[in-house]
C-alpha cells in the first residue's frame, strides 16, 4: 500500500473556465506562487490577463478555434487526454508524448447559471444557449480521474483547496481530491 506522501499529486497545469470570477485572484495568486501553468477559455482568459496574470487560451493550447458560435470551446482530445490519463500507466504516458499532450492536474470550472437565467427569461433560444456542455464534461473527466486530477466547481472550495495545496507544497492530497 502506498504511503501518504505517494498519494499527494503535484499540480503543474490547470484549466480554468469560470462563470463566477469573483475569487479568481485568490486562486491565481496561489497558482503563480507554485508556477502552475494556466489554460483558460475566452472570458476567463480575458479576466486573468486583466488582473496581470499569464495564461494560454484554450484555442491556442489545442491549436483549434472555438466553433459553432462558441458552442465548442473545450471539447478537445488534448484537454481530455491530459485530464483523463492515468499517471501510473506507461501506455497513457506514451500516448500523451506521441500526441504532444500534457497532463492537466487541476480543473476549475463553474457552470453556466442556467437556473438563474431560467428565472429571468422564458426566451427559448437564450435558455438553450445557456445549457453548459463543456463545463460539466471537464468536471466529469476530472472526477473520473480523481487519483491524479483535482477538480473545483465553486469559489466556496478555493480556501480549502489553497489550504491543502499549501500544506502539501504545490500538491493536493488524495483525501482532498476524493
Regions found by a protein language model. Give the residues of each.
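Short acidic, glycine/serine/threonine-rich loops at helix termini
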Residues: 26-28, 49-53, 60, 66-70, ...
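Short, basic, glycine/proline-bearing loop/turn elements
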Residues: 10-14, 77-84, 123-124
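Short amphipathic alpha-helical segments, especially helix-boundary/capping motifs
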Residues: 2-5, 18-23, 70, 113-117, ...
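A generic local secondary-structure boundary/capping motif
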Residues: 3-6, 69-73, 93-99, 127-130, ...
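Helix N-cap/beta->alpha junction signal
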Residues: 20, 41-42, 89, 135, ...
Amino acid at each position: 500500500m502506498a504511503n501518504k506522501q505517494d498519494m499527494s499529486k503535484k499540480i503543474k497545469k490547470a484549466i480554468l473556465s469560470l462563470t463566477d470570477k469573483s475569487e479568481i485572484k485568490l486562486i491565481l495568486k496561489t497558482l503563480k506562487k507554485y508556477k502552475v501553468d494556466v489554460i483558460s477559455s475566452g472570458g476567463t482568459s480575458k479576466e486573468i490577463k486583466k488582473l496581470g496574470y499569464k495564461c494560454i487560451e484554450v484555442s491556442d493550447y489545442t491549436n483549434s478555434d472555438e466553433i459553432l458560435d462558441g458552442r465548442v470551446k473545450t471539447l478537445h482530445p488534448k484537454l481530455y487526454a491530459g485530464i483523463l490519463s492515468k499517471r501510473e500507466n506507461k501506455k497513457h504516458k506514451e500516448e500523451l508524448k506521441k500526441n504532444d499532450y500534457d497532463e492537466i492536474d487541476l480543473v476549475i470550472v463553474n457552470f453556466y447559471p442556467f437556473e438563474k437565467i431560467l428565472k429571468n427569461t422564458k426566451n427559448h433560444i437564450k435558455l438553450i444557449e445557456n445549457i453548459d456542455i463543456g463545463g460539466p464534461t471537464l468536471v466529469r473527466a476530472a472526477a473520473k480521474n480523481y487519483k491524479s486530477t483535482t477538480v473545483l466547481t465553486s469559489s466556496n472550495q478555493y480556501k480549502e483547496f489553497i489550504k491543502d495545496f499549501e500544506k502539501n507544497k504545490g500538491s493536493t492530497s488524495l483525501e482532498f481530491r476524493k
